[in-house]
Amino acid sequence: MVDNSKIRVVVGMSGGVDSSVSALLLKQQGYDVVGVFMKNWDDTDDSGVCTATEDYEDVKKVADKIGIPYYSINFEKEYWHRVFEYFLDEYKKGRTPNPDVMCNSQIKFKSFLEFAMDLDADYIAMGHYAKTITDANGVTHMMRPKDGNKDQTYFLSQLSQDQIKKVIFPLANLTKPQVREIALANGLVTAKKKDSTGICFIGERNFRKFLSEFLPAKSGKMVTPEGKVVGEHAGLMYYTIGQRQGLGLGSTKESTDPWFVVGKDLKKNELIVEQGYDSPLLYASRLKASDMSFFTGKPDHDFEMHCTAKFRYRQCDIGVTVKYHADDNTVDVYFDEPARAVTPGQALVLYNGEECIGGGNIDAAFQEDKQLQLV
């Protein structure tokens, strides 16, 4: 039996079942486990309930049950400056950001990791479904977990080698139903707690109302690609490429097909819409992404490779050819087949079989040489 008692693991506990079971498993494996609850947002919800207070109460109950010390740390300032300001800035540019990716790289695996090191941690852990392996050269690789349905490598795609070397993923070889079974069998109060959804740390609230508190909305025209006015939008920031719901447009004499957002004209403050799921303006042959991050380290030379990619969570992998440019740390990604609703601001994530290679931020989508969507 391996003696882990001198290895300290600081577990980020959210008050959910996944991080609760992570802490439990590490404790059962003999590690010196410390639980820490992160407060990153003043998260009174739309009904006036402060969900952080309830979550922290659950953390305390779980920590007491499994017999570990626990603390609370406030990262609201760091979250505001490193994640939320970026989030707002992307919306101002007409893009659709993914704050969860930034939250992981800047808060959970940076601010929290630094705090854990001050607690003399050897490793940190949370409730993510991901897996790492270390090769013979001591390089750590990010891998898909057992539960493909809960795979969170997409959201971890911009972590560095230094960050993932310090992480243990206790749920790597478990499915979500198994995690709930373990929680139930061990009497954890979080066993039947529903999964959190919504923006990282901000949670489930009326998104349009929430965003309008920070960015003034400016209504404008909804137009077809030919320039015909067909309606009015409530503010470009509220819409994303490929969106169908919430446009308030009906069928026309020419077609009963539903309408979709196919672009945004920022200068004219116009939302470009077209009927039909298969609108050619929704299909890209390639994209450009920047600020690339690779788990095994930043390459020092240009390269070309064929692999698979995702440009949104829960998307099936698609075949791509990647051309990396070392001088500005960008990639041009060519799709094997035209890809629908590639959205600037979202994360591009690259895979080679079961391994997650890394990712970056999508800047633009193209149909051959024509840039789509943002004009």
UniProtKB/Swiss-Prot annotation:
GO annotation, cellular component aspect: cytoplasm
Keyword annotations of the record: ATP-binding, Cytoplasm, Disulfide bond, Nucleotide-binding, RNA-binding, Transferase, tRNA processing, tRNA-binding
GO biological process, one term: tRNA wobble position uridine thiolation
CDD domains: MnmA_TRMU-like (cd01998)
Binding site for ATP: 12-19, 38, 127
Enzyme Commission designation: 2.8.1.13
Record's keyword annotation contains RNA-binding: yes
Substrates-to-products reaction catalysed: S-sulfanyl-L-cysteinyl-[protein] + uridine(34) in tRNA + AH2 + ATP = 2-thiouridine(34) in tRNA + L-cysteinyl-[protein] + A + AMP + diphosphate + H(+)
Residues annotated as the enzyme's active site: 103, 200
Origin: domain of life: Bacteria
Gene Ontology terms, MF aspect: ATP binding; tRNA binding; tRNA-uridine 2-sulfurtransferase activity
Region Interaction with target base in tRNA, annotated ranges: 98-100
Positions of disulphide bridges: 103-200
Enzyme class (EC, first level): transferase
Pfam families xref list: tRNA_Me_trans, tRNA_Me_trans_C, tRNA_Me_trans_M
Summary of the function given for this chain in its UniProt record: Catalyzes the 2-thiolation of uridine at the wobble position (U34) of tRNA, leading to the formation of s(2)U34.
Family matches, as HAMAP family: tRNA_thiouridyl_MnmA
Name of the protein described by the UniProt record: tRNA-specific 2-thiouridylase MnmA
Organism, as annotated: Lactobacillus acidophilus (strain ATCC 700396 / NCK56 / N2 / NCFM)
Gene coding for it: mnmA
